[in-house]
């Protein structure tokens, strides 16, 4: 009972001079939490004494923890370029500077400077994408799942959409194509078998209620062996014959020729635009290497109907997304791929990666065991399943730490590596030159040098 009576009152405790600079409302909340925790521990006989100085330190530490941003900078040393858990594609610092003046000022987001009246936010991006892809019109929403939902809700609500059974994918986070379709109001008609679907499967499934033939890219898995699927150009032709909409959910998609034979595994937006499709959609933050966005391209008449759907108000993107996306598309249009970090990392040769690895090795070789290795990695982001690309890594061992301990120590410093063959690796496919000295500093900290 004595300890309970010794717990200070909140209103008196917060007058401590060490709290002078703290905002009162937050200070009161934190103090109440610290004192409540103290009270509970006393009742559980977990402590025998405490001091006011200890409580002050706990309050200050909790304040520091609460006000520290949860979203932090990470050095990605996993080698996975489009790392879903680490923010997918990076935005180039120079690109961010180019759009900084736009997003920190009033701008013409929905204002027509020539006519002096209300304009359309999508007009800023449409010209660049139309020139790049040769499409009639463009619409941008907040991600590709939104694009799928909006398209289905607009053109197939209470109608049938024919899809191959082998393409009913789960795109991550338990979001499944059939569930998205159901929520949109569309009725799924699945055809074919898991491993084989033929054009006649689509033909036989078409009824008076059918509005769309849909193809979904199997971005995060592959079917090999005794398998076949219908080419999108065949679906486009069939859709025209039956007066239906053809739509390809391309997932990642890509706008440039990819290295390491990756073109064989990922659909090219440019290639499929040659079929003059009704609609295509793909992600902005995967192989395009830009911001999170769902990019819908296709015929003007269909894009116009999508723009009239009231759901678009909930799915639209803001000025920062549009400004950065426009910058990325212009970089691709001008073939300035070095301005897009995702593509720069993807196209980097192993010779370049080895040069960077040797710089770090030279900086830390006197304080730890480190070896430059040839390895392989994946692109990530649900792209090119089962396809590995060459990379260079630095295997590091400090003192007698096991690889799991090494991974934990580096992770505590916001450097995420990977464990391979019982060794802790830093993969240079995703490490930038500007990060090498920072990594070297962390190695010295861990080694207590």
Curated annotation (Swiss-Prot):
One of its GO terms (cellular component) is cytoplasm. It is an enzyme of class 2 (transferase). Pathway: Aminoacyl-tRNA biosynthesis; selenocysteinyl-tRNA(Sec) biosynthesis; selenocysteinyl-tRNA(Sec) from L-seryl-tRNA(Sec) (bacterial route): step 1/1. Its main location: cytoplasm. It is found in: Cytoplasm. InterPro entries: PyrdxlP-dep_Trfase, PyrdxlP-dep_Trfase_major, SelA-like, SelA_trans. Its cofactor is pyridoxal 5'-phosphate. One of its GO terms (biological process) is conversion of seryl-tRNAsec to selenocys-tRNAsec. The modification N6-(pyridoxal phosphate)lysine is found at residue 286. It catalyses: L-seryl-tRNA(Sec) + selenophosphate + H(+) = L-selenocysteinyl-tRNA(Sec) + phosphate. SUPFAM superfamilies: PLP-dependent transferases. It comes from the Bacteria. Pfam families: SelA. The keyword Nucleotidyltransferase does not apply. One of its GO terms (molecular function) is L-seryl-tRNA(Sec) selenium transferase activity. Its EC number is 2.9.1.1. Converts seryl-tRNA(Sec) to selenocysteinyl-tRNA(Sec) required for selenoprotein biosynthesis. Belongs to the SelA family. This is L-seryl-tRNA(Sec) selenium transferase.
